[in-house]
Amino acid sequence: MDIYKFAISPLLFNVVKTDPEWLHQQTIRSFSWLSQTPTSWANQRLQKSLSLYDSHLEQKLFGLNFPNPVGLAAGFDKDGVAAGIWSNLGFGFAELGTVTFHAQPGNPRPRLFRLPLDKAALNRMGFNNLGAAAMATRLVQEKQESTNLIPIGINLGKSKVTPLEEAAQDYLDSFRLLKDLGDYFVVNVSSPNTPGLRSLQDASMLSAILNLLQQENTTHKPIFVKIAPDLDWVAIAEIISLAKTYNLAGIIATNTTIRRDGLKTQVINQTGKSPQEEAGGISGEPLRDRSTEVIRFIWQQTQGEIPIIGVGGIFSPEDAWEKITAGASLIQVYTGWIYEGPLMVRRILEGLLSKLEQNGFNSIREAVGLEIKSKK
């Protein structure tokens, strides 16, 4: 029996009603300690229990080797303090951040809320982090302490104090500090929790950012852009065009949504207000279908030429398979992992292997875009 899913999670979410941000802080501290003691008995037990290695799940994409397609989404390890632990928890890659050039406290608390009835979370964190320089220092130390077995991405955001017209330089300053320490990089212009940030998805604004980054990117690190689920098809098509123009490694689809339709939660206990009255982005199950629609659209528009990392509402092997067959080469989890617990990654990987066997596939790559291919 999965003790976390059936006992600990319901207790924390529905009975004790622990503050989600406090619980997250304690968890990341524990993971940070484990990350700094890579040969510990605890790490060995975690790896044995939670990891699954199978050549059918391996892929080489944009020059990087991924042992499996399930990654940790940005937002959990904002400062890269636990970068060395994620492979032991079964992940095939992990994305650190979002990190900004200037350290910043984020938005006032409370700013993170669980919506158990919807299997969702609402957050308005506001890119709280210690800054790019602090992350760089930590990752240099991490490289000395352990050898990462999985690709590590770094998600870059705009500092709140930086005016929108200076955003490109702000992203560039962070990239310069971190470019030798991450395996791939993500331009986050889609969080709803930094004033004006989503306007950077506009073609002219985004073009300026990508142009500066690629000029600096002499070692050809893979660069992605992460987009919002709330964009219309025309705006997404413009971003696809920019991805081709600036030779991006791919697109991450999607960030959290500002939509509130269909939610079962009437009142958030911490504030006494409805989700409709609270600012922030919704993640988890309510995002699942829309993020898959965006993945499908990108695949159809590009015929699979631009790799997609799919994220949003993944809780089960079926959810993961749906994202992959819609066109995602890789997937990321966060909210689902919080609800389902640490065994979720292994369960998804086992489920994907079963799907491959059922379809007579030798590699997970054969499943990417299968839904669209089969309709031709």
Curated annotation (Swiss-Prot):
Pfam families the UniProt entry points to: DHO_dh (PF01180)
Record GO biological process: 'de novo' pyrimidine nucleobase biosynthetic process; 'de novo' UMP biosynthetic process
Active site: 191
Cofactor(s) essential for the protein: FMN
CDD domains, per database record: DHOD_2_like
Cofactor binding description: Binds 1 FMN per subunit.
Residues making up the signal peptide according to the UniProt record: none
EC number: 1.3.5.2
Pathway stated in the Swiss-Prot or TrEMBL entry: Pyrimidine metabolism; UMP biosynthesis via de novo pathway; orotate from (S)-dihydroorotate (quinone route): step 1/1
Main location: membrane
Positions annotated to bind FMN: 74-78, 98, 155, 188, 226, 254, 284, 313, 334-335
Record-stated family: Belongs to the dihydroorotate dehydrogenase family. Type 2 subfamily.
Role of this protein: Catalyzes the conversion of dihydroorotate to orotate with quinone as electron acceptor.
NCBIfam families xref list: PRK05286.2-4, PRK05286.2-5, pyrD_sub2
PANTHER family: DIHYDROOROTATE DEHYDROGENASE (QUINONE), MITOCHONDRIAL (PTHR48109:SF4), DIHYDROOROTATE DEHYDROGENASE (QUINONE), MITOCHONDRIAL-RELATED (PTHR48109)
Protein name per its UniProtKB record: Dihydroorotate dehydrogenase (quinone)
Native source organism of the sequence: Nostoc punctiforme (strain ATCC 29133 / PCC 73102)
Encoding gene, per UniProt annotation: pyrD
